[in-house]
Amino acid sequence: MINKKISLGVLSILTAFSLQSVSYACTGFIIGKDLTKDGSLLYGRTEDLEPHHNKNFIVRLAKDNPAGEKWKDLSNGFEYPLPEHSYRYSAIPDVTPNKGVYDEAGFNECGVSMSATVSASANDAIQKIDPYVKNGLAESSMASVILPSVKTAREGVALIAKIVTEKGAAEGNIVTLADKDGIWYMEILSGHQYVAIKFPDDKYAVFPNTFYLGHVDFNDKENTIASEDVEKVAKKAKSYIEVDGKFHIAKSYNPPLNDANRSRSFSGIKSLDPDSKVTYKDSNYELLQSTDKTFSLEDAMKLQRNRFEGLDLKPLDQMALDGKGKPKSKKAVKGYAYPISNPNVMEAHIFQLKKDIPAELGGGVMWLSIGSPRNAPYLPYLGNISRTYEAYQEKSTQYNDKSWYWTVSHINDLVAAHPKPFGTKVIDEMKGLEKTWIAEQDKSTKEISDLVVSDPKAAQEKADKISLDRAEKTFKRLKAIEAKLVEEKPKNKKGLNRS
């Protein structure tokens, strides 16, 4: 057993981050199917809040609910009636449900996938007119209420719209839902205002914690779902802005772009398309980005691991290591910025949706890294699994050597604290594993897809076995890497190992 102790060096890095004015820091992305090398739709998110925040990966089984039973969010008092029957779905919850469940992302048994949410906030003028509702719908409840209740992505968007209209939103959020017909991108703008669009197949997007929608055709009911008063509220708040004679949602609802959102928007776009004309000084970044390039799953993984490679910026968390002291709140430091891959990442997920994968399997694969993928691998999971590996289910709020999250967290801490001796050895091995799994995944998915038609139960058992075996082998390897890093880390002047 390895005793988990964090060195002063690591603590100084994490403390530096806590001093930043980044109260939430998820980064989402979408790559339309016309822009991928294999025709798959790619979308996902890094879930960011703070270091050392345990996440689980579980499956919530289908169930019938008694009449009148409600979902209750203990973190803010939100309640909503449960459906007569809840569909099975996978989830990535927190381990402190009294502070919010935060199921975050997963597939349901109907082939709907969801990532919820990228937090955002309307400007002060908007909030005075349509304030957020304390016990309204929040990220903490989003996936838990929607995934067990809907058969299509559009139904999911419509249900969110209904709840926000009737009960209000507790906060601003960006939500993505997808199925065999494509992906919806939704912005919950203020207490009762929202806009959702069917995302175009020939565009890509990178979206950290601010709103991005520009002009939307509200008359296009097939591809748009919006609240009735979204323009009226902006006009009443005197924050209404037009671009080229048309209402611009983001410019009307957003506060000024902050440095953390600027750095992640810019670096994310540049990660996917180095030839993009965006600059670090742009006043805003459009949601729908165009390119003549095509992308792979590995490009999406690279995006979520981005730390300004190839750009004239350094990650903010390196400041303590570089001897420049702790960053001061709300004060930019030249040359340093907030990266997509940062110490606050608690998990990262990528949905890879393909037309030839049945809805019973989720219509695709979720590639998941519990813990930051900076030095950990993405593992593939189909949407029909019924259980997950035991290391994903440890609920400790402190280091636990049986926990996937805490093991990865420790590995990341060790590599961050000792970059010179450890270098890229760990991540290089992780990328090698991912390359093998990507090559294997099409074959195993085809076999399970063929089986699900004749024997859904056998298909589920096979998907379970493959994913459980892979997770068990990978976790054993992660434990071996963790032990080796502890053994090889530099000693201090007294000859003692520094954790």
Swiss-Prot record:
Pfam families: Peptidase_C69 (PF03577)
GO terms under biological process: proteolysis
Annotated catalysed reactions: an L-aminoacyl-L-amino acid + H2O = 2 an L-alpha-amino acid
EC number, UniProt record: 3.4.13.19
Residue ranges of the TM segments: none
GO molecular function: cysteine-type exopeptidase activity; dipeptidase activity
InterPro entries for the chain: C69_dipept_A-like (IPR047804), Peptidase_C69 (IPR005322)
EC supergroup of this enzyme: hydrolase
Catalytic center residues: C26
Keywords, alphabetical: Dipeptidase, Hydrolase, Protease
Family: Belongs to the peptidase C69 family.
The protein, known as: Probable dipeptidase B
Encoding gene per record: pepDB
